[in-house]
From Swiss-Prot:
Coiled coil: none annotated. It comes from the Eukaryota. This is BAR/IMD domain-containing adapter protein 2-like 2. The gene is BAIAP2L2. The IMD domain consisting of an antiparallel dimer of three-helix bundles, featuring on one side a positively charged. The N-terminal alpha-helix inserts into the lipid bilayer. Also forms homodimers and homooligomers. The residue Trp-141 is essential for oligomer formation. Residues 299-313, 403-413, 452-462 have a biased composition (Low complexity). One of its GO terms (molecular function) is phospholipid binding. Gene3D superfamilies: Arfaptin homology (AH) domain/BAR domain, SH3 Domains.
Length: 529
């Protein structure tokens, strides 16, 4: 046999062997993996349907809320859009299953038998033709030795068989190569169809989401505005110190943990550096009307009183003696419960009995005197009953009345008490009330610090220095010249001999320890002991 024919034969057999032992098993494995991919598609579709159905239910619940209708509409639209895209994804799954996997599985089973038969047929035909050619060549060699007269005819027959054999092996190799190419082209064309289906799906998804996402973003950003996020009926009158982001509940679901510097006094923040302000905190220019509406300036004698208490995080309205029994406070302004049934509703001047000794995030829990209604209410809306009723529309500054009533010479500016309106005491530090006049800060800065440290915290910033309850308003309005002179003397002596700090600056070994404030998300009624 000629070497070139043997080479053609070996090459053709290698192609058939590659199809049978490599391509077809790989195609079977591809069908198996495709079925797993298909099951994952169905699982994804079912999980997405359940997930976005739950989002739609939450959005429908938000539509019933008077404060979150815009956000509820956004959630419902998002859910509908995603479910529509999920249905379009089913078309991709059907194309992948019907147009690719089924054809691959069917063709693989048929092709295995077809390639096997083709290989056997080629091998038998090649051997038969090779045997005939070998036989004719042997006969020609014998006839040439005998010098037979039919040698010429035999040579022509051998040449004809040789040409046929060469044409056969060449055509068989081209046919085997064509079969191999046809199979790879089938695989490429089927996946091209799948890719085209994916392209159509993603094109529709892009066109559907491109404009809607921008609209949802604008509506979501617009809902951050307090005028749209809350209705006027739920907010009530703008009296008392404001709450960040208009929060009217004692919980902080979305409040991140704050650094220690935000819970210390304004003066300590200047020494330790700024950790950043809360994004939702209102600026000092917006806090100014609230400071004028609810003034609470302690008198000189109560400001520098030497009465020591064990903690500076006591609840608002606690008696100076620290005795047992419920504390009573008087409402400065009206408070509406709105749609939240856990809030306490009362009017200005009502007396509320505080049932929880400590405030939680600036909220107290109490019971309206004379009724069985109980619930949460802002600490800034009430005042200790011992201070007496105060008209919120007519602020009283004790230092101003004391200065106008006293005929004494004006005090030295170095000893002058800064005239500023202090907010209702929360559970944060009051060290700025005892600052020396030289280190006093501006009123707007003090209020900015107070607005950032609204959440109750047990993290001490310096020595505990709780402020006792101020004098009743009746005493401030009817203070005589004798009381004024006594208060001024106490003030002068307090400024000359300031109270000793428990931990002087630089001696507290735990001054740099940062504690994480505790936050409760429980809106239910507390356990009253």
């Amino acid at each position: 046999m000629a070497p070139e024919m043997d080479q053609f034969y070996r090459s053709t057999m290698a192609i058939y062997k590659s199809i049978m032992e490599q391509f077809n098993p790989a195609l079977e494995n591809l069908v198996y993996l495709g079925n797993n991919y298909l099951r994952a598609f169905h699982a994804l579709s079912e999980a997405a349907e359940v997930y976005f159905s739950a989002i739609q239910k939450i959005g429908e619940r938000a539509l019933q809320s008077p404060t979150s209708q815009i956000l509820g509409e956004i959630l419902v639209q998002m859910s509908d859009t995603q479910r529509h895209l999920n249905s379009d994804l089913e078309v991709v799954v059907q194309t992948f299953h019907g147009g690719l996997l089924q054809h691959m599985e069917k063709n693989t089973k048929l092709d295995m038998q077809f390639i096997k038969d083709s290989r056997q047929h080629y091998e038998l035909e090649y051997r038969h033709r090779a045997a005939n050619l070998e036989k004719c060549m042997s006969e020609l060699w014998r006839m040439e030795r005998k010098r037979d007269k039919n040698v010429r005819e035999m040579k022509e027959s051998v040449n004809r068989l040789h040409a046929q054999m060469q044409a056969f092996v060449s055509e068989s190799q081209r046919a085997a190569e064509l079969e191999e190419k046809r199979r790879y082209r089938f695989l490429a064309e089927k996946h091209l169809l799948l890719s085209n289906t994916f392209l159509q799906f993603f094109g529709r998804a892009r066109g559907m989401l491109q404009n809607r996402v921008l609209l949802w973003k604008e509506q979501s950003e617009a809902s951050r505005s307090p005028s749209r996020a809350h209705s006027p009926g739920l907010l009530g009158p703008a009296l008392g110190p404001p709450y960040p982001s208009g929060r009217l509940t004692p919980t902080c679901l979305d409040m991140p943990p704050r650094p220690l510097g935000e819970f210390s006094s304004p003066r300590s923040r200047h020494g330790s550096g700024s950790y950043g302000t809360e994004p939702d905190a209102r600026p000092a220019s917006q806090l100014e009307p609230d400071r004028r509406s609810l003034p609470r300036t302690p008198s000189a004698s109560s400001l520098y009183s030497g009465s020591a208490q064990s903690s500076r995080s006591n609840s608002f309205g606690e008696r100076p003696g620290g005795g047992g029994g419920a504390r009573r406070v008087r409402a400065l302004v009206s408070h509406s419960e709105g749609a939240n049934h856990t809030l306490l509703r009362f009017s200005a001047g009502d007396v509320v009995e505080v049932l929880v000794p400590e405030a939680q995030n600036g909220w107290l829990y109490g019971k309206l005197e004379g009724s069985s209604a109980s619930g949460w209410f802002p600490e800034a809306y009430v005042k200790a009953l011992e201070e007496g009723p105060v008209n919120p529309m007519t602020p009283v500054t004790p230092m101003t009345s004391m200065t106008s009533m006293s005929p004494m010479t004006p005090m030295n500016p170095g000893n002058e008490l800064p005239s500023r309106s202090y907010p209702l005491r929360g559970s944060h530090s009051l060290d700025d009330l005892l600052d020396r006049p030289g280190n006093s800060i501006a009123p707007s800065e003090y209020w900015d610090g107070q607005s950032r440290s609204r959440t109750p915290s047990r993290v001490p910033s310096r020595a505990p220095s709780p402020a006792p309850p101020p004098l009743p308003s009746s005493r401030r309005s009817s203070m005589g010249s004798t009381a004024v002179a006594t208060d001024v003397k106490k003030l002068m002596s307090s400024e000359q001999y300031p109270p000793q700090e428990l931990f002087p600056r630089g001696t507290n070994p735990f001054a740099t320890v940062k504690l994480r404030p505790t936050i409760t998300n429980d809106r239910s009624a507390p356990l009253i002991r």
